[in-house]
Amino acid sequence: MPTQIRFGKGRINELKEIIPSYGKKCLIVSRPFNGSLKKLYEKINKILEDIGVSTFVYDGIVPNPTIDGVNEGVKIASENNIDFVLGVGGGSVMDSAKLIAFLKNKDSKINWNEVTKKYNNPFKISEKPKDAVPFIAISTTSGSGSHCTQAAVVSDLEKKEKITVFHSGLFPSVAIVDPELMLTVPSKVSSATGFDVFAHAFESYLGNLTSPLTEKMSFEAINLVFEYLPKVINDPENINYRSKMAWADTLAGMCLSNGGADLPHPLGEIIGGICPRISHGETLAIVYPEFLNYKENISPQKFSLIEKETGLEKIGQSLTLKINTLLKEINLYDSFNYSNISSNEIKLISNHPLLDILQPENSSEIKNIMNNSLK
C-alpha cells in the first residue's frame, strides 16, 4: 500500500510538516463545516495559512456522495489549478475527494461511462490520468477504510445506482488518523461506520485473495470491533475506545484493498443506489442476517477458524450468533424496519439486474438473500 499512514492522538498537528511537499494551492473537500468540524476547519486553515498555502473549499459533500458533487469539485479544482486535495471527513468525503483529485482535468468535465469502464478492476495496473493531483486524507470517522484503499464509491441519482471506481492512484498519498477528531461522532454514525469496519475485515477474509498477512489483520480487526464498537456507542468520548476502532478501521481497510468484499457489499450498494437516504453501514446491516445463514453453510471452515481466533469456540457461541448480537448491541439489527423502504423501492431492489450477474450468476440463493432481507 503506497499510503503513508500517520496514526495516533495529536497527529493532526503534523499537517504543517506534510503539506509543503505537495504545493501551494489546496482544495479542501468536506461536508458543511459546522459544530466540531468548524473548529477543525479553522485549525487546518490556520496551519495552511501559516505555511503560505492558498486554500479553496468545497463543502458540498453529502452522505452517499453523488457524481454531481464530484463534478462540482473537479470544476473547482480544475479552474483554480489546484496542486493537491485535502479530504476532511468520513467515507463520503474521502471517496469524493479521491475522485476529485484523480479526475481533475483541464476541461473540468468527466465522462462517467468511460471512467466506469476504464477503472473497474481493483488489481489492474494502469496509468492514472495525466492531470491527477495528490490526495491527503484526514479521517474523522472509523468506518469506510477509504484512507487506505484504492476504491471510491459514488451514487448516480439519475440511474439509481452506485458506481465503484478502482485505481491505485486512489490511494491517498498521506492519511492522518487522529482519534481525537472522532470523539464527537454521533452514536448512530459510529454504529453504521463501525459495522462497515467489521464487514471489511470479515468479507475480505471470506474471499479467495487472502494471505497470511491479511488473515492476521482480519482477525485482529474483528476482535477489536467485537470488543470496542459496543463500548464506543455507550461511551463515545472515550479516547481509548475511539483509538481501538480507528486502528480496526485501518487494518480492515488494508484487508479490503487486498482481498475485496463479499456479497453484502454489492447487495448493500443496490439498496443504497435506490435509497440513497440509507447509510452504507445500515444497508449492510439489512442484508447481513440472511447472508450469514447462507454463508455459514458454504464456508464452515472459515467460520470455525474465526470462532477459534475470537475465543467464541471456547464459550460455545457461533459466529453467526455473535454477529447478530453485535448488530443488536449497536442498534442495527432491525435496520430494515427503521429504513422506511417503500413497496415500489422494494420492487426496484428485488428486480435489480445486478442480482443476475453476481457470482454465482443467476443464483436463486442471492435473490433469496435480498428478498428475505426486505421482509
Give residue spans per PLM region.
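Short alpha-helical scaffolding segments that buttress acidic/His motifs in well-ordered protein cores
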Residues: 198-202, 242-253, 288, 323, ...
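C-terminal charged capping/lid subdomain of soluble metabolic enzymes
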Residues: 307-375
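Short glycine/serine/threonine-rich phosphate/pyrophosphate-binding segments
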Residues: 12-15, 36-40, 67-69, 92-97, ...
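Carboxylate- and glycine-rich phosphate/diphosphate-binding segment that chelates Mg2+/Mn2+
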Residues: 149-258, 361
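Glycine/threonine-rich beta-strand-loop-alpha-helix active-site module
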Residues: 68-180
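ATP/NTP phosphate-donor binding region
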Residues: 1-84, 336
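Active-site segments that bind and position negatively charged phosphate/pyrophosphate groups
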Residues: 204-322
